[in-house]
């Protein structure tokens, strides 16, 4: 019974394939499932299964993404693969597919190309912590020297984007040959997965991080006090614990005197729970949607940040016209809209950009009118009159 084995409790890791168009990301993904299927650790999928990915909507943006799952000896993986370059950009920026690590696929026949660079930069900007390189199509290159040169070029490129180029494993593979059942190339896929197991760190579980809950609603209950409701994003909170209310106004301290879920009282709430927290000494008018409750001292509010942004095309429901530095949209952060100004745009090479068109990916500097609990790696939407016109991720906190 292979089915039982599949449900063993292994640590779960989210990964994906990234890299230039036609370098073989989807073929490699199919090859991984086929090689692991022979050990009963995956369901074999062919190129067509993965390439015909259904459309999904994430924050009002349509993205095509294929999801496959498989196991290695020590882990369970969820793996995302996107058919088009624009899908990758949207996926990584919206965090629709949060990646704990990625397999960078680069063809030995071409070496690193424009999107290879762009995906490495994006991985850095959105906080993908680790990469493993699959040097694909190695069956088509006879000259060992060419392969060595391409490897050197990839390592230098990784270094230039602050990834540890010397330490990242580069495994020579052929997705196509492995799919065809060539045992030499199948063993290379196994080698690749061993490198992924070893080099992509296990993500810290949300429950082990410091407590944070974004406030969605506030009620006042006669005789009991004020209750803030929301979904606990990370960590846990116990009755009697001190927490801080952060964002929009000055940070203040309060004590959680009750945790309630589905009208039942709990001793503690934890990551993923939708709860109501009863707060001591707080009036209903003191707190509002958009503030967060956090473990004391774990987070400070900010107003100025850099972000990597994808601007929606007209067909995606975005703007029809370009905008310029000085543009004042709403930033939808966690649970609320905050007005802000985009003070500057810069391109990948650091040059200032005057005008941004629908469909562009751009780096921006934003300034909010009031301090909010923003953090590096956090996702946000840019909205105008209630409709989403862009999606972004905080790449750096300025102040």
Curated annotation (Swiss-Prot):
Region called G2, residue ranges: 60-64
Keywords from the named record: Cytoplasm, Elongation factor, GTP-binding, Hydrolase, Magnesium, Metal-binding, Nucleotide-binding, Protein biosynthesis
Location (main, coarse): cytoplasm
GO molecular function, one term: GTP binding
SUPFAM superfamilies named in the record: EF-Tu/eEF-1alpha/eIF2-gamma C-terminal domain, P-loop containing nucleoside triphosphate hydrolases, Translation proteins
Region described as G4: 136-139
Domain of life: Bacteria
Stretch list, region G5: 174-176
Binding site for GTP: 19-26, 81-85, 136-139
Catalysed reaction equations from the record: GTP + H2O = GDP + phosphate + H(+)
Subcellular location per the Swiss-Prot or TrEMBL entry: Cytoplasm
Stored InterPro entries: EF-Tu_GTP-bd, EF-Tu_GTPase, EFTu-like_2, EFTU_2, G_TR_CS, P-loop_NTPase, Small_GTP-bd, T_Tr_GTP-bd_dom
Region ranges (G1): 19-26
Annotated EC: 3.6.5.3
Keyword Membrane: no
Binding site for Mg(2+): 26
Domain (tr-type G) ranges: 10-204
GO CC annotations, alphabetized: cytosol
Region (G3): 81-84
Pfam families: GTP_EFTU (PF00009), GTP_EFTU_D2 (PF03144), GTP_EFTU_D3 (PF03143)
UniProt keyword rRNA processing present: no
Subunit organization: Monomer.
Family: Belongs to the TRAFAC class translation factor GTPase superfamily. Classic translation factor GTPase family. EF-Tu/EF-1A subfamily.
Described purpose of this protein according to its UniProt entry: GTP hydrolase that promotes the GTP-dependent binding of aminoacyl-tRNA to the A-site of ribosomes during protein biosynthesis.
Protein name per Swiss-Prot or TrEMBL: Elongation factor Tu
Native source organism of the sequence: Prochlorococcus marinus (strain MIT 9515)
Gene giving rise to this polypeptide: tuf
């Amino acid at each position: 019974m292979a089915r039982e084995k599949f449900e063993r409790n292994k640590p779960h890791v989210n990964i994906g394939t990234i890299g230039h168009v036609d370098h073989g990301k989807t073929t490699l993904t199919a090859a991984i499932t086929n090689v692991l299927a022979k050990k009963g650790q995956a369901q074999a999928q062919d190129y067509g299964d993965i390439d015909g990915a259904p459309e999904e909507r994430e924050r009002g943006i349509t993205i095509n993404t294929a999801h496959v799952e498989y196991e290695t000896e020590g882990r369970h993986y969820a793996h995302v693969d996107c058919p088009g370059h624009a899908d990758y950009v949207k996926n990584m920026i919206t965090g629709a597919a949060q990646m704990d690590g990625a397999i960078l696929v680069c063809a030995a026949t071409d070496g690193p190309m424009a999107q290879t660079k762009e995906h490495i930069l994006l991985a850095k900007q959105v906080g993908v912590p680790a990469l493993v390189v699959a040097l694909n199509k190695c069956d088509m290159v006879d000259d060992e020297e060419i392969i060595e040169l391409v490897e050197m070029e990839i390592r230098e490129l990784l270094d230039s984007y602050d990834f540890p180029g010397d330490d990242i494993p580069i495994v020579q593979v052929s997705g196509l040959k492995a799919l065809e059942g060539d045992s030499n190339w199948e063993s290379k896929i196994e080698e690749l997965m061993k490198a992924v197991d070893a080099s992509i760190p296990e993500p810290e579980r949300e429950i082990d991080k410091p407590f944070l809950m974004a406030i969605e609603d506030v009620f006042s209950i006669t005789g009991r006090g004020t209750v803030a409701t929301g979904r606990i994003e990370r960590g846990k909170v116990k009755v009697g614990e001190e927490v801080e209310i952060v964002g929009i106004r000055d940070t203040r301290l309060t004590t959680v005197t009750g945790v309630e879920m589905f009208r039942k009282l709990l001793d503690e709430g934890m990551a993923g729970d939708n709860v109501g927290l009863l707060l001591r000494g707080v009036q209903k008018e003191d707190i509002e949607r958009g503030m967060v409750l956090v473990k004391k001292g774990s987070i400070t509010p900010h107003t100025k940040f850099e972000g990597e942004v994808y601007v929606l095309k007209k067909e995606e429901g975005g703007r029809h016209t370009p905008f310029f530095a000085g543009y004042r949209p709403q930033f939808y952060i966690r649970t609320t809209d905050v007005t802000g100004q985009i003070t500057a745009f810069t391109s990948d090479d650091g040059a200032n950009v005057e005008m941004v068109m629908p469909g562009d990916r751009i780096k921006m500097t934003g300034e909010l009118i009031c301090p909010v609990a923003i953090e590096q790696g956090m996702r946000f939407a840019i909205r105008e009159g209630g409709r989403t016109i862009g999606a972004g991720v905080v790449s750096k906190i300025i102040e």
